[in-house]
Amino acid sequence: MTQSIRVAVSTVILTLRRTESGDAVLALPLVLRTREPFADQWALPGGWLTTAESPVDASARTLSETTGLAPSYLEQLYAFGAVDRSPTRVVSIVYWALLRQDDVDAQSEAHRASGRAPENVRWFDIDDLPSLAFDHAKIIEYALWRLRNKVGYSRVAHGFLPSEFTLADLREAYEAILGKSLDPANFRRQVEASGNLLPTDRFRTGSHRPARLYRYNTDVALADRGPLGPEETSIR
Amino acid sequence: MTQSIRVAVSTVILTLRRTESGDAVLALPLVLRTREPFADQWALPGGWLTTAESPVDASARTLSETTGLAPSYLEQLYAFGAVDRSPTRVVSIVYWALLRQDDVDAQSEAHRASGRAPENVRWFDIDDLPSLAFDHAKIIEYALWRLRNKVGYSRVAHGFLPSEFTLADLREAYEAILGKSLDPANFRRQVEASGNLLPTDRFRTGSHRPARLYRYNTDVALADRGPLGPEETSIR
């Protein structure tokens, strides 16, 4: 049987970056398309699924080729397949990951040094996105919705933070994800009651009064992929 | 560009059915394959995605053709795309839904009466599945894992119940999903504290002492599809 339907992958990589005004905002990398359809418009990193690789491997490959980024875990976001989402019939399997800003900086720098980094990649704050190709605006909106839902019942914000962090760091990540301010005292009570955080003996010192550093309780696995093996869920 | 990758859909339909011994067990419909690959083995209802329909519409169509079932909402479970999951290269987008046993009975009966019901469909209890084609055993295992996870933070068990039910009915559904017995008093405390249930003025009477009927608090939508439209998420 011949099908005139092709399979593509796209990847939503979110990081928390500090603006010049000192705020933390969510940002993601986009690629300026050089050919039709949607030439000269921005799109998520991605490409065609090839015969010899799984969708998650294709996501990792195309992400690495364009941005140099190599997240330790890519989660499947959704398979988008509406009939009219592209001028030709394309089903896109979309993956997503959260990356710490320092990992983004290190991996991007190594990619530039390799001489293989394309010129047409740029990071955008999610509240200042350009016009997007295909249904990629909707895909990003869905990824942000999923992130906001997930932050309520999991340790997803950990993906933005170093191994040790202050409660103010964690609250700042939650505020950027949820797009609203949180009361510091309420936030402290809630995260302490959750049992997810363990206090360390260390403090961050600086211009403010010393703030205790916390780490996540790693008795619970961060990325529980359930019964699926690595061929369906992550990068080998 | 030509891709030798084809796109299929499959559907996992779960219901809670009562065995002859009076227990409630999870069950799902399977289709006996009549051709290669995996001829004479059981598989999930499904088929090829056609050019003019979205994956969720293809799931609804193939499910209806084989089983006569028409769930009001199909949720995307996962896109399975491992290279070796089929003798040829196939990406399967899998949807799932929960159906009440009385809806299953009514829709199956109407399908049989139509004269279009195929002979090769049968329901199986999930603890007594036959040998399955492709990676369908893993897909079912993943659907059950997702259901068990979801029951903890959502009203997913509602999909198995009529609009009014006793706490014993609800506990029985949870026990079938989780595969373990739950303490009746603890269970009552937890669901009452959740705020998800509203007591009615009605009682079920019969051979036992009268049991109060409850309904779900429908202030919260049961199936929150987020920012995705119906072309990606459900049946029109």
Predicted regions and their residues:
Chain A
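Short histidine-centered catalytic/ligand-binding loop motif
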Residues: L44-A52, G159
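Active-site segment of metal-dependent pyrophosphate-handling enzymes
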Residues: I5-V9, L26-A27, P55-A60, S64-R112, ...
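Short, charged/polar surface micro-motifs in flexible loops or helix N-caps
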Residues: R18-T19, E36-F38, T50, L98-V104, ...
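Long, intrinsically disordered, low-complexity Ser/Thr/Pro-rich regulatory/activation regions
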Residues: P199-R236
